[in-house]
Amino acid sequence: MPRVIYFDCFSGVSGDMALGALIDAGVSLDDLRAMLQRLGVGGWELHASREVRGPLAGTRAHVVAPEDHHHRTLTDIRALIAGAPLPSAVVERSIRIFTLLAEAEARVHGTTVDQVHFHEVGALDAIVDIVGVVAGLDLLGVEQVFASPIPPGAGWVRSAHGPIPVPAPATLALLASVGAPVTADETPFELTTPTGAAILAALATFRRPPMRLRAVGYGFGARRMERPNALRVWLGDMDDETDVDQDRQDRTSAEHAGSGESSPVLLETNIDDQPAEQIAYVTERLREAGALDVWCTPIMMKKGRAGVLIAALVPADLEDRMVTILLRETTTLGVRRRAVERYVCARDIITVTTPLGPARVKRKWWRGELIGAAPEYEDCARIARERGVPLTTVYQTVMGRLEDASSVTEH
């Protein structure tokens, strides 16, 4: 059963509230600090303290960082995160969050993503907040993120551009980009920050899933209010037995995905006048923005010119974002689209214990039958480096232990 987390945003969401809630739910503060130190940026401190606010006990997380005068671009932040020795899921999720932030800022200020200079969002404490939340999810083994409707708050707040209405324009742009549900809450404070909105817009599905609950965490915000200023997270394992109808729906969609409103969209465009490194950048952007798959095919175009067909299979609710990336990042004048249906195998992840060390294995299921399994590359590569053995040897060792039930741990 996949590990899932539900963000219960009854008083909004911010980066520090999310950090506190994850620590309260079981993330080791030492492990989290160690993960963040891999960014290679010094000067920050991460503190967490237990507090009682009214009827609730929880954790207040606080990032202390020197005043940061760097106005980083998305390219700067991408390079910082991608160059750090972090798990691939942490890198991909973190970059996806910052990409959404850049796109929201560009829409609000009427500029392009490349011209956006992050101020508050690009400050060191915000980088630690965002990468810290993603690292915390990874340390908890979370595979899927869910969230409740979001109360944005009301009133006014100070920003680098002067006073702005609440919700902040960037917050609204982020929530609108994914069609996030919001509540009619008139609390005269900023309940949801751009950082919090970006985290959920990039990672969450907005519904409460059936789960077998394992832990609950409360993360407090800095402001003290009459009601608890807290974010609650529910950590658990997706449980088919808790909802038979949901189970049937999930199994059907896993095998025959793409019917009705959930049909993915296939986007295609032909390019014959851009260098290969720019095409590679476009495909990377599409994947970071949430494409299900991206591929390129060599083609012959008019006048015998060699070209490339860029194709992206994308969720329907992300179609506009993907089309915008293709139009902005390539020389194309148009993008073809069509709704498609697809068959998708159900999958799960187990951990296999071997003499070389533990490694995760992704298993493939079709109509209740196990039809394939593949070791996770990141785990095998780490073991190969640590043990000084060939990568192929690690793969063979992991696959050889699959049949031994005592070596397998279900997630």
Swiss-Prot record:
The lineage of its organism: Bacteria, Bacillati, Chloroflexota, Chloroflexia, Chloroflexales. Signal peptide: none annotated. The keyword Transcription does not apply. GO terms for molecular function: lyase activity; nickel cation binding. PANTHER family: NICKEL INSERTION PROTEIN-RELATED, PYRIDINIUM-3,5-BISTHIOCARBOXYLIC ACID MONONUCLEOTIDE NICKEL INSERTION PROTEIN. Belongs to the LarC family. It holds the Pfam family Ni_insertion. InterPro entries: Ni_insertion. The keyword Nucleotidyltransferase does not apply. Residues 245-254 have a biased composition (Basic and acidic residues). Keywords: Nickel. Residues 241-266 are annotated as: Disordered. This is Putative nickel insertion protein.
